[in-house]
């Protein structure tokens, strides 16, 4: 096999090391790869293919790590975004009608989505869901299973985070119902939420499907304990099923978080859930960002 010419990528990589720590952020940092073969700087994409700065073409099997569910530069989606920019504007930092339209669409598709809160990233959504659960239950502890983002309470790499941050967060293994039940027995009176990826995808490990009874076992235990069950559907949402993995698996959580494939690459995420739990976000829980009410992401999501 002929070795790829990556000379332009390597030149940009050398420059980037001066501008950006490690040149590239995230789990795809250069030290995880073969020297001289990575990082590759991409210049454009169309449909299911992307091209780097050296002209090499690739099939985007990762779909940009999840968001590009339909294809790069999908004309129908990009057209509604351009129309919004040209004719209406998009950064108002105030509520726009598209919020209601999108919330109604999610309500029709997702079993638990009685109400919705829209944000930007998956980490925004998982962190907001945990905060809502703690406020709703007046409890502190979180039982988690899977990758839930880079924020302090859940990140896999602990550099720069005080150890006490993890005192109220305990991890159990996917499909290990017995181990989960032991944690619930130990911490039950103070467990605010159980957050789990309904399709198992631990960081850098193979994906897993739930064993019979696993998700229902979580549902039964959390209901009995008055604990909020959260499905992290950032990856599975709109991919396993339009309504998330909760539809084919037949287990309805109290809250769910969605993102990635929601708007074909435009940055948006959501916490959706039952009104009885979400109501604390009216006054008691503060969730805010200048860029959360973004009409470009709204119209892209609606078109997607």
Show which residues each predicted segment covers.
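Conserved N-terminal phosphate-binding loop of PLP-dependent enzymes in the Aspartate aminotransferase
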Residues: 2-304
């Amino acid at each position: 096999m002929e070795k790829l010419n990556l000379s332009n990528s390597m030149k940009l990589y050398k420059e980037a090391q001066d501008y950006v720590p490690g040149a590239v952020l995230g789990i795809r940092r250069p030290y995880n790869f073969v020297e001289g073969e990575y990082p590759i700087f991409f210049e454009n994409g169309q449909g299911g293919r992307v091209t780097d700065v050296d002209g090499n073409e690739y099939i985007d099997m990762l779909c940009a790590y999840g968001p590009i569910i339909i294809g790069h530069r999908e004309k129908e989606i990009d057209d509604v975004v351009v129309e919004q920019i040209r004719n209406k504007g998009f950064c108002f930092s105030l509520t726009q009608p598209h919020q209601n339209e999108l919330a109604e669409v999610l309500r029709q598709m997702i079993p638990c989505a009685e109400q919705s809160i829209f944000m930007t990233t998956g980490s925004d959504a998982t962190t907001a869901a945990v905060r809502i659960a703690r406020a709703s239950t007046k409890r502190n502890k979180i039982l988690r299973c899977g990758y839930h983002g880079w924020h302090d309470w859940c990140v896999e790499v602990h550099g720069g985070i005080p150890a006490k941050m993890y005192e109220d967060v305990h991890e159990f293994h996917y499909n290990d119902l017995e181990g989960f039940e032991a944690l619930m027995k130990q911490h039950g009176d103070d467990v605010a939420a159980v957050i789990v990826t309904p399709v198992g995808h631990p960081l850098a490990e193979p994906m897993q499907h739930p064993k019979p009874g696993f998700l229902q076992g979580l549902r039964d235990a959390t209901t009995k304990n008055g604990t909020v069950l959260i499905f992290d559907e950032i990856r599975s949402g709109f991919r396993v099923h339009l309504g998330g993995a909760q539809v084919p698996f037949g287990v309805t959580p109290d809250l769910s978080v969605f993102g990635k494939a929601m708007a074909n690459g435009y940055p948006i995420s959501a916490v959706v859930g039952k009104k009885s739990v979400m109501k604390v976000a009216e006054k008691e829980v503060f969730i805010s960002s200048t860029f959360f009410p973004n009409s470009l992401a709204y119209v892209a999501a609606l078109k997607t």
